[in-house]
Amino acid sequence: TDAQFKVKHTFDRKNELAILGLGAIDDMKLNTGMEDMSEKNQYILAYLPVVKQKTYTLGAVYKHYSGKNIYSLIVSRSQLNNKNIKYKDNDESSEENLTLNYRSDEIENKLRSENIFRFPFFRLNVGGNLEYATYTNRTYQKQFTTIPRVINYHTDLGLLKWGLYATAIYESDNERFTASLGVRADANDYSPEMNNLLDQLSPRLSLSYRLFGAVYLNGSIGRYYELPPYTVLGFKDNQGNYLNKANHLTYIRSDQAGLGLEYRPSSYLKFSAEGFYKKYDQYPMSLVDSIPLASKGTDYG
């Protein structure tokens, strides 16, 4: 089930407010009463948990117009709630049959302020953001291995994040050449390795040049930083300590470069062919098999 809404109000020629929201509910059920109970279907039903997911985002955007310049203030709140439940033989008649009960919540509250200044052939965007996020995880799981064991895990995490950014965009008089130069810096209060904006400084440059007609040559290069997943940030050891904080976890870094051709036959249609190079560094890895977490699939045990 999905739902969304948007309400926009114009106070006067210089001020407007938009409020919007969207949400989704996924409520999965196992079809244990199917007629074709083949061996394959029995296997799938035996390990697949019941998944329930709820997510929503609510936000408001205030804009003030001053000549060619625009000031924006954006506030939003989003939540992702996940539940995975599994009973042995899908028999819910007794709690003794419960083999998995996973519940997690990710909540983000965001505030962003942005100014857009317009000049002849030139535009400047500057802004900053402040966010507070919470993450909780409650997991009960019975593992039937060589030595059966019960996992009873819980964690809570609160994280304050902040950032600054600026982008300058130039466009020639005949619109033949366009250049964009930007920089962004992010930090948070998770650990000393993450609370300095200069340690996560992200410069980026993109260029576009019209070779002839509607054919353009595009190129870009930049460095980007990404916060590790909340599951990694909030992971605790048996003593209740954030394990990856002690491991000096840092932002994930990605250096990227791209080059390509673009054909724009009209204002609403374009064709492009591009090549990219990406190099990742400081990516979290699994200690069990030394595989980056991005390459590991989901295993319901």
Write out the residue ranges for each language-model feature.
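Residues on the lipid-exposed face of transmembrane beta-strands in outer-membrane beta-barrel proteins
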Residues: 5-9, 60-64, 111-117, 164-170, ...
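Repeated loop/turn-to-beta-strand initiation elements of outer-membrane beta-barrel proteins
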Residues: 14-17, 68-71, 81, 121-124, ...
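Flexible loop and strand-edge segments within Gram-negative outer membrane beta-barrel domains
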Residues: 16-65, 71, 79-107
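Transmembrane beta-barrel strands of outer-membrane/channel proteins
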Residues: 19-25, 73-79, 126-132, 181-187, ...
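Surface-exposed extracellular loop regions of Gram-negative outer-membrane beta-barrel proteins
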Residues: 25, 31-38, 74-98, 136-143, 158-192, 209, ...
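Outer-membrane beta-barrel transmembrane domain signature of Gram-negative proteins
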Residues: 50-54, 64, 99-178
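Outer membrane beta-barrel strand-and-loop segments of large Gram-negative receptors
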Residues: 104, 108-114, 152-165, 246, ...
